[in-house]
Amino acid sequence: MEAATGRRTRHVGRVALVWFGAVLLGSRLAGAAAPGQDLRQTYRSAIDDTDQPYRIYLPSAYDGNRAWPLIIAMHGTGGNEATLFDGYENDGAIKKAAEANGALLVSPLGRGVTEFRGIGENDILCVLEEVAKRYRVDRDRVYLTGHSMGGTGAAYLALHHPDLFAAAAPLAAAYSFPWLARNAATVPFLWISGAKDSDFYMRGVLVGVERMLKFGGPVTLEVLPGEGHRGPVQDFHRVFAWLVARKRDPHPQSYFFEVDTPVHGSAWWTTVEKIAEPGRMATVRAEATSRTTVHLQLENVAELGFTPDPAVFDVEQALAVSVGNTEAGRFKIPAGQALRLSNVSGRWRAEVKPAQPKALTGFRQFPVATAPEEIDMVGTEKRLANWITDAMRAATQADIALYNAVYYRGLPIPAGTVDIVDLIQCSRPFDEELVTLRLSGREIRQMLENNLPDPGKSEPALAVNRAGAGPIVQVSGLRYKFDLKQPAGRRVVECNLDPDRTYTVVMEGQVMARDTLRLGAHFKKVNYTTTPIGFTTALYGHAARSGVINPAREGRVEEVR
């Protein structure tokens, strides 16, 4: 049996936390049938013509005669497709859990340390399609889980593709994408964290979970007392049992969908093709009020594609379409066609045109700007950081933006055509909401000082090292010079801020719980406002408004040699 002790429930704010004591994997797994097949496979990537690996486990009862649930399990930082199968000293517990719960189990590489965004997300979707071709997969019972970075990735994919997945179980995730929280209405979530894990992880999860619960999403947050970062991976059996009990509704009569960029604009029978004001969320509320009537409520949407689902609508009849309080008309939309709605000067125009859906596994399909040359994170004053901080200020109207790349895992913005996916990849690892706070010029100068490297000390080793990673604060709205030969506390030798003036400052939300931007005496003590703007969403808005990405080095950050 499985033994569980000390179970109790308490409420913190709006979030119900379910506490579980130590859990032992007992004879329930030991009595499983003979082992199934643990296979190492690859697919050929259309992006770069390489073979990308994944591990898949086929339970002993799998014979291809019926469709099976599929659980996609994503590894953490520094891991690979084998980590969850062979690591964590758990004697293959994840495969035993898949066997006991009657599910196919696959773990992709995800292209390594990508946060499962950009090319990492593409890898997950390609593996899903590949496995569905090779094996009998129940597409209404496809699930996401993962640990740490993989838990964050599970949340990212489920919230961006609520029409694809039946449920998600992020384990020790780092953040939760609160601006997409309403997309959890159709995707049940089981978040599991360790009570002794870093505050960074708990804050990152809570901010999204609270918003999900506010809107009535089917969300559970469990905190394991006495457990740290690896605690949530100790009982895959219980996690998998929870997952396989859920089933996707492939043909909803109504839904609400939040969209941050057009890369993730499609769900069910609508596609946001163009956002009216990039950098702000677009929303779609769609309802089939009858078999021949659809009502749409759209916010910040400039162009929308509507492809009626034959399971929901009578596609042999003309469909009555309304947007807000406006009747768009009645339209016969044959197979292979879509209704394109465009907002022109505040009025909706509709036209039936050939459907042109983007491939789910396509890559770099959404050009947004151009760059005359590659923009990277190299140097004392980093050109990419100049552009990022300008985007943060533009999104929030703050006086100053502060950003550093101490955990940077991103990629340069390429020369030539810049796609939205390039913006998603340039900003990794973090993608949390932006926060604003009020600080004096004197306080800001001290923060700049706090983040200067000490020549006599080495910086903490990072799990991943990318060119340009480092602690020196990058800025917009100010300039400063530093001299590392000066004594600590006096190394910032010039700064153009008024020490007595109070400024509105924008930062990434993660710095409020993880001292990556060394806030000194303000860490976990300063009052701040959480904006509804995601980090990557701000970059998309800035790129779309300018159309050209070509930041200069302007002397914002200089070292005295």
PLM regions with names:
Residues 163-174:
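A conserved short beta-strand
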